[in-house]
Amino acid sequence: MADQVSPDQGLVIELGAGTGNVTQALLDAGLSPDHLIVVERDPAFYVLLKQRFPFLKILRGDAARLRRVLAPLGISSAVAVVSSLPLLSMPKPIRQRIVEESFAVLAERGTFIQYTYGAFSPLRRRQSGLKGEVAERVWRNFPPAAVWRFRRRGSAAHVA
């Protein structure tokens, strides 16, 4: 999943970091801590992330209210949103709100990257005006996992 983000392109927002495995992979891939903001809703994971990554900007908040969560930092644009949220298990209105909030903070040519299980897209691409593709499959997982990359239709990639 970290391979989908180019470390020198700009600000990356991670949603639902949990214990920080993807966070660590992003840092290991060369993403500067100054270019990563982590948003975590769960209080226990938030505390764990603050302890594990004291040098990162970690915000406690709901991805469905992403603009409000980022507002105190004055952040209004990112080149990528990386999500490990279980979108497929969420009610459609919440899933839709998270995607809308993510694209509201993405630069015009920004990318929404979603890790998910199963063979199907976690987002309805045609209805949402997005172009989606499987960027990577992880066959070692059971069930197999997929990394999906979504952009607005007609935009080129800013991330690898």
Q: What positions do the PLM features span?
A:
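Conserved beta-strand signature within the Rossmann-like core of class I S-adenosyl-L-methionine
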Residues: E108-T116
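Conserved SAM-binding loop of SAM-dependent methyltransferases across substrates and taxa
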Residues: T19-L31
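A short glycine-rich, Lys/Arg-flanked "PGG" loop and its adjoining helix->strand segment in the class I
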Residues: Q96-E108
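Conserved SAM-binding loop
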Residues: L49-K50
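Conserved alpha-helix/loop element of class I SAM-dependent methyltransferases that forms part
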Residues: M1-D8
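Core SAM-dependent methyltransferase catalytic element
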Residues: R137-A160
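Conserved SAM/SAH-binding beta-strand->alpha-helix loop
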Residues: D42, D62
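Conserved class I S-adenosyl-L-methionine
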Residues: Q9-G18
